[in-house]
Amino acid sequence: MARILNIEIPSNKRVVISLTYILGIGKSLSKEIIVKANEKLAKAKEKTFTEDSRVKDLSEEQLQAIRDSAKTYLTEGDLRREVSLNIKRLMEIKCYRGIRHRKGLPVRGQVTQKNARTRKGPRKTVAGKKGK
């Protein structure tokens, strides 16, 4: 297993797929990283690789080029911290989205009269009136 951005990525998979094991890197960003790494390798007159190459077949120079290209993006812990700080900021300024976060309700305008059980949690039963 190769180590990129302190994450062990699977060696037997294609490079494009392996990079998606890192939080914050999807398929399109993975392809972008590979293009940048290949440009860097071409400048240094090293052997380039394709998206279909397996991680286990890459040389140390190629892996280092991928590491350097991936460093420029916000990933893993830094990304988690950024997202949590954004949510905290919304709650502090008491905007509509922040209030929805604080109350544990859907934030993006979904209807909540009958649905949104995942966000609201299990039903809280209310006792009916006794002795009509």
Curated annotation (Swiss-Prot):
Keywords: Ribonucleoprotein, Ribosomal protein, RNA-binding, rRNA-binding, tRNA-binding. Gene3D superfamilies: 1.10.8.50, 30s ribosomal protein s13, domain 2 (4.10.910.10). One of its GO terms (biological process) is translation. It holds the Pfam family Ribosomal_S13. GO terms for cellular component: cytosol; small ribosomal subunit. It comes from the Bacteria. This is Small ribosomal subunit protein uS13. The lineage of its organism: Bacteria, Bacillati, Mycoplasmatota, Mycoplasmoidales, Metamycoplasmataceae.
